[in-house]
């Protein structure tokens, strides 16, 4: 199946009451594990690529070529989107679009509102011309992700969310409502009241960033309030690192990367399968 944008995927998920996971790519093994999990679970999937991970893997074009080749090799039949995670500028989004990404996130949430609207609208115009979906963010998701550091959480303003959607034509919205990137210190405190209000007023599928460590009950509640995309990266990184440590602790003389990265790949796959089942996306493709 060819790569697709997120639009239909997320609208269907919102309608049917489940969420599609965005799982971030960090290297070959992450890409293999996530695609294998999606095909086995018969789940649609979004492959997230941050600017930093894109650079690490040799550029956006390299990532697209790798994903397409693996999809062919694994005979992938489920819908797959390649999505730029936290695109920092119009230029970065344009680069991803021209490299073959099927979806982009423009994150101008740290700029004043009017500037966020102007930048986002410009990205939407280019993206939609190429059949690419667009995600935008309002408020501030806490924690750190690659080049993006946000200390505290600034909740999104429901009225601004509605205005951003109306003035830009984005396909999905990531309102910051208490989630953070990276491991949580204590229990996450999600703003469900705001989530419900934003979901109703915009009518768009909502996106939950920082999906690692959010209790299942909160995940289910978020989905019931219109969240159709949940981002996961830290959990896969932790499980893969744990597998590498365990392998090397048991065999300190091991030097063949396949012998320690193989178990890491399996650990990622298991984690992703668990998330797909939790989000309700298994058997939806």
UniProtKB/Swiss-Prot annotation:
Belongs to the class II fructose-bisphosphate aldolase family. Keywords: Glycolysis, Lyase, Metal-binding, Phosphoprotein, Sporulation, Zinc. The keyword RNA-binding does not apply. Catalyzes the aldol condensation of dihydroxyacetone phosphate (DHAP or glycerone-phosphate) with glyceraldehyde 3-phosphate (G3P) to form fructose 1,6-bisphosphate (FBP) in gluconeogenesis and the reverse reaction in glycolysis. NCBIfam families: cbbA, fruc_bis_ald, PRK08610.1. SUPFAM superfamilies: Aldolase. Pathway: Carbohydrate degradation; glycolysis; D-glyceraldehyde 3-phosphate and glycerone phosphate from D-glucose: step 4/4. It holds the Pfam family F_bP_aldolase. The gene is fbaA. The lineage of its organism: Bacteria, Bacillati, Bacillota, Bacilli, Bacillales. Its EC number is 4.1.2.13. InterPro entries: Aldolase_TIM, Class_II_FBP_aldolase, FBA_II, Fruc_bis_ald_class-2. The modification Phosphothreonine is found at residues 212, 234. Binds 2 Zn(2+) ions per subunit. One is catalytic and the other provides a structural contribution. Zn(2+) 2 binds at residues 107, 137. GO terms for biological process: fructose 1,6-bisphosphate metabolic process; glycolytic process; sporulation resulting in formation of a cellular spore. Zn(2+) 1 binds at residues 86, 181, 209. D-glyceraldehyde 3-phosphate binds at residue 50. Its cofactor is Zn(2+). This is Probable fructose-bisphosphate aldolase. PANTHER family: D-TAGATOSE-1,6-BISPHOSPHATE ALDOLASE (PTHR30304), D-TAGATOSE-1,6-BISPHOSPHATE ALDOLASE SUBUNIT GATY-RELATED (PTHR30304:SF0). Phosphorylated during sporulation. It catalyses: beta-D-fructose 1,6-bisphosphate = D-glyceraldehyde 3-phosphate + dihydroxyacetone phosphate.
């Amino acid at each position: 199946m060819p790569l697709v944008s997120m639009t239909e995927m997320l609208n269907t998920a919102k309608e049917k009451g489940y969420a599609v996971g965005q799982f971030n790519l960090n290297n070959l093994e992450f890409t293999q594990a996530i695609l294998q999990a999606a095909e086995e679970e018969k789940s649609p999937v979004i492959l997230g690529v941050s600017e930093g991970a894109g650079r690490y893997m040799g550029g956006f074009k390299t990532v697209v070529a790798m994903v397409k080749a693996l999809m062919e090799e694994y005979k992938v039949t489920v819908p797959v989107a390649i999505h730029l995670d936290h695109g920092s500028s119009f230029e970065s989004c344009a680069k991803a679009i021209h490299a073959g990404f099927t979806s982009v996130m423009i994150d101008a949430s740290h700029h004043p509102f009017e500037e966020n609207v102007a930048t986002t609208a410009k990205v939407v115009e280019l993206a939609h011309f190429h059949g690419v979906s667009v995600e935008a963010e309002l408020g501030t998701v806490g924690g750190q992700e690659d080049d993006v550091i946000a200390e505290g959480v600034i909740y999104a303003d429901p009225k601004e969310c509605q205005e951003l959607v109306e003035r830009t034509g984005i396909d999905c919205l990531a309102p910051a409502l208490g989630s953070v990137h990276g491991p949580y210190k204590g229990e996450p405190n999600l703003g469900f009241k705001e989530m419900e209000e934003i979901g109703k007023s915009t009518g768009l599928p909502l996106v939950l960033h920082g999906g690692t460590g959010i209790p299942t009950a909160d995940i289910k509640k978020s989905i019931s309030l219109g969240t159709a995309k949940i981002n996961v990266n830290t959990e896969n990184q932790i499980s893969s690192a744990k597998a590498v440590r365990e392998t090397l602790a048991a065999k300190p003389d091991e030097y063949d990367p396949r012998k320690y990265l193989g178990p890491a790949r399996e650990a990622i796959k298991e984690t992703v399968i668990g998330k797909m089942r939790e989000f309700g996306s298994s058997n939806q493709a």
